[in-house]
Design a protein with these regions (language model features):
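ATP-dependent carboxylate/acyl-activation modules
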Residues: 1, 5-259
Length: 260
């Protein structure tokens, strides 16, 4: 802890004396050891975090894990990408319609493989699954709602034949009840919650600079936080689009703009 604090204050001093754009230093605490890296042989692997100054309520270290195996590197990148996607969709709906619907997304290897909005959490979940019944197999699901028995049942059973539950790697939500946890039987299935998912808005977009390690250094770039505004003068087209088509456009934009 003392070494961490010293490193952090040395970094702040160097940035102040050298000019904020001339020096980049970062000190983070080890938050958790990951099950394995991007591939099983890439171990050890870990997640570091620093939320002591201007904490991010949607930071990966702010999620509580209720059951399942330890997160892997791919689980962490999937979660990060899903947070990026769901916050962009929420921002788009708030800007264009003044409210944020229930949003359900599924992802595999950091890209969405299903996405839907609904008037209820169950409706959003079922629509997301119905987009491609096979694509969600083994994937990660995120929903900006509290999961109770109806939501858990939809996630595990909707459009499934027989008694088997849908095979998933992780479920992420704003919260989950004990009753819902009780019907999630698969030991490996990771379940994580963060109440910040329940209050998504345009302010939920990532604000910190985007960092990318490159050989010999680091690239720093502002976050791509453009939010599509369908009323903007620059947007032109032929004919009129109805309200449902506008909602479809915002959903498609939110997913497409945050996919690799």
């Amino acid at each position: 802890t003392a070494e961490y604090e010293c490193a952090r204050y040395i970094g702040i001093s160097a940035q102040y004396l050298g000019g904020n754009d001339q020096v980049y230093l970062s000190a983070m605490r080890r938050h958790t050891e990951l099950k394995y890296g991007e591939n099983p042989y890439q171990s050890p692997s870990a997640m570091y975090a620093d939320n002591r100054i201007n904490p991010d309520p949607l930071g990966l270290d702010q999620f509580t894990q209720h059951k399942g195996h330890t997160l892997s590197y791919i689980n962490a990148t999937d979660l990060d990408r899903l947070i990026n996607s769901i916050t962009h969709i929420a921002a788009g709906f708030e800007k264009n319609f003044g409210n944020v619907p229930f949003i359900a997304l599924g992802a595999k290897h950091s890209n969405s493989c299903g996405g839907a909005v609904g008037e209820t959490a169950v409706q959003a979940i079922e629509r997301m699954i119905e987009g491609d019944l096979r694509a969600i197999f083994g994937g990660v699901i995120i929903i900006n709602a509290v999961i109770d028995v109806p939501e858990a049942t939809a996630i595990l059973k909707h459009k499934m034949d027989g008694e088997n539950d849908r095979l998933l790697d992780a479920i992420i939500a704003g919260g989950i009840t004990d009753e819902a946890l009780a019907i999630i039987k698969r030991v490996k299935l990771r379940v994580l919650t963060n109440p910040a998912l329940l209050t998504l808005s345009i302010d939920s977009l990532e604000q910190r600079s985007k960092l990318r390690p490159v050989r010999g250094g680091l690239l720093i770039n502002p976050q791509p936080n453009f939010v599509l505004d369908l009323s903007a003068e620059e947007i032109t087209g032929t004919g009129e689009i109805n309200e449902q088509q506008k909602r479809d456009i915002i959903l498609a934009w939110g997913i497409g703009s945050t996919s690799q």
